[in-house]
UniProtKB/Swiss-Prot annotation:
It is a lipid-anchor. GO terms for molecular function: G-protein beta-subunit binding. The keyword Ribonucleoprotein does not apply. Keywords: Cell membrane, Lipoprotein, Membrane, Methylation, Prenylation, Transducer. G proteins are composed of 3 units, alpha, beta and gamma. Interacts with beta-1 and beta-2, but not with beta-3. Interacts with KCNK1. Interacts (via C-terminus) with KCNK2/TREK-1 (via N-terminus); this interaction confers ion selectivity to Cl(-) and L-glutamate. This is Guanine nucleotide-binding protein G(I)/G(S)/G(O) subunit gamma-4. InterPro entries: G-protein_gamma-like_dom, GGL_sf, Gprotein-gamma. A lipid is attached at residue 72 (S-geranylgeranyl cysteine). It comes from the Eukaryota. Residues 73-75 form a propeptide.
Length: 75
């Protein structure tokens, strides 16, 4: 019974150490305000709008996924 408790506390200590390491890593990360991140994202999207095929469709002649116009007849 004592061995089971020891194993449980070892697991708990291991999990706590992992949590502390994760928190230390997160504390060192540079933070950006949401308003600044949103402004940066909007500026990026506006700068690359001409390259976005979801906004400006790919011309049919360049679209590799266009429907093929070949017709087959089975005799």
């Amino acid at each position: 019974m004592k061995e089971g408790m020891s194993n449980n506390s070892t697991t708990s200590i291991s999990q706590a150490r992992k949590a502390v390491e994760q928190l230390k890593m997160e504390a060192c990360m540079d933070r950006v305000k949401v308003s600044q991140a949103a402004a940066d994202l909007l500026a990026y999207c506006e700068a690359h709008v001409r390259e976005d095929p979801l906004i400006i469709p790919v011309p049919a002649s360049e679209n590799p996924f266009r429907e093929k116009k070949f017709f087959c007849t089975i005799l």
